[in-house]
């Protein structure tokens, strides 16, 4: 890449070239895929191994306030035909305690969906599906179901909350593994997920959708840039630079220049970013 161009300065072919490298695992791309309720339903039917489940409501970037009034944004929150809730999260980097993130999300959804004056037995079931590029439990399975078990008896007990961890690292020839392959290499149309792959190709080829994706990426990048300038922290700037390289296809030098990193500090940033 020889220099940074704003979306308004790019030709359609340049936009298509940029979008061609995006995958379903990328935050903004995943968000656009989940705006289609039928696509969300297709994905969940494969992961939950339930071909009859129906998604009644699907909200990408669902915002829920915690007890302190701070808004937490979920990647997508769905409600099915049985009134059960399902939060789907996608994660590329192994950089946090993901099990605690799942626990936190489930608690927020339970608080959000519990109506005042109702008995606990009326609390809706909550499922969190955590999709990652890495194997959270490092046990060579493409999918893990986490159950509550009584230690003394080995009995499985239910409280309406469940967790499923799916990863794209382990290839085991299952339907879930095949779906995950498409999440990380989102090109062409895939028989196992026709609705998802059709929508992917629409956003990678059609002028309106290609431009929309590019503009969303630019908006996210500019918001991150302002955040980095306001914070003034080197660690935050490094994270944003890495995002520019990974998600926007910028060279490391162009990303540093965009973040207004002095020329004499670029090598230090490169070393700390490990790029």
Each language-model region and where it sits:
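Accessory alpha/beta interaction modules
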Residues: 1-159, 172-174, 227
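Short, well-ordered beta-strand micro-motif
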Residues: 130, 165-167
């Amino acid at each position: 890449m020889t220099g940074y161009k704003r979306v308004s300065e790019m030709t359609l072919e340049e936009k298509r070239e940029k979008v061609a490298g995006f995958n379903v695992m990328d935050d903004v791309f995943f968000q656009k895929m989940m705006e289609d309720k039928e696509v969300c339903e297709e994905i969940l039917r494969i992961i939950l191994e339930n071909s009859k489940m129906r998604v009644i409501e699907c909200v990408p970037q669902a915002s829920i306030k915690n007890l302190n009034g701070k808004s937490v944004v979920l990647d997508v929150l769905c409600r099915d035909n049985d009134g059960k809730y399902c939060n789907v999260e996608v994660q590329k980097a192994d950089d946090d305690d993901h099990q605690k993130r799942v626990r936190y999300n489930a608690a927020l959804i339970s608080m959000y969906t519990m109506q005042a004056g109702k008995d606990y037995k009326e609390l809706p079931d909550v499922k969190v599906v955590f999709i990652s590029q890495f194997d959270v439990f490092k046990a060579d399975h493409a999918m893990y179901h986490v159950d509550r078990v009584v230690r003394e008896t080995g009995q499985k007990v239910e409280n309406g909350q469940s967790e499923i961890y799916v990863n794209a690292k382990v290839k085991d020839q299952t339907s879930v593994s095949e779906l995950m392959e498409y999440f990380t290499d989102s090109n062409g149309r895939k028989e196992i997920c026709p609705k998802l792959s059709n929508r992917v190709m629409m956003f990678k080829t059609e002028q309106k959708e290609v431009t929309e994706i590019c503009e969303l990426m630019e908006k996210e990048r500019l918001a991150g840039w302002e955040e980095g300038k306001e914070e003034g922290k080197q660690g935050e700037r490094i994270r944003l630079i890495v995002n520019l390289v990974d998600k926007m296809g910028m060279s490391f030098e162009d990303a540093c220049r965009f973040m207004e990193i002095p020329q004499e500090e670029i090598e230090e940033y490169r070393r700390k970013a490990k790029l």
